[in-house]
Amino acid sequence: MAEKMGYDLSEEEKTAIIIQLRKLLEGRPEISFAYLHGSFVENETYHDIDVAVYLRDLPASVLHYELELEAQCAQVVSPGVVDIRILNGAPLSFRYNAVKQGFVLFEKDDDERADFIEVTLGQYFDFAPYRAIYLKEALGIGV
């Protein structure tokens, strides 16, 4: 199996990418807020740039929207691949990890983001005991 190619950039180069992404995505009126998360944020070497966006209204085709936005980002971000995911309706674990481990790229409406965080954290912690039981019984993992 082939290894993923990693990119190793200075903090200045990463900051330049963040500025480019923020400018592009903040200019999109349908995006209320965005998180940057994943290896680009957590490690010196990254494989892709993970961006989670919250939309005011969902498009007819979520996949088409994500691919179109990824293509736009690829035109302004180098090096690397940008992986866009929509937070609206995303799995709970994804939403929680984007909030917990990522950082806010921008927000246009802090109340909307605060509501999103409140709902996500509430659902996550309500579900946590069931997740622990599942992991223990199905996978033998103690949490």
Residue ranges and their predicted role:
Residues 50-54:
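Short beta-strand->loop micro-motif that forms the acidic, two-metal-ion catalytic signature
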Residues 1-35, 41-46, 56-143:
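Catalytic core of pol beta-like nucleotidyltransferases
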